[in-house]
Amino acid sequence: MYRNLITTNPNVMMGKPVIAGTRITVEHILEELAAGSTTDELLEAHPRLTREAIQAALAYALDLLRTMKAAS
């Protein structure tokens, strides 16, 4: 689901995963949601962001956690 929406590039945001075509990191989206921001607030603050991209960031984080758990 997220593979076309989340990209990494060592020359963009120090290689952190970002929403494709932006400099919005997955980390930033997760931090905002964890701090209590709503999806609508994120969309208002970042006009290039979409609901699909926010869902992709969550799916990416979940996949990463599952990968880490499987490796331990």
Can you annotate each of these PLM segments?
Residues 17-60:
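Amphipathic, hydrophobic secondary-structure cores in small proteins
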Residues 64-65:
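Hydrophobic, amphipathic alpha-helical faces that serve as interaction scaffolds
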Residues 68-72:
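Short Lys/Arg-enriched helix C-cap and helix-to-coil transition segments
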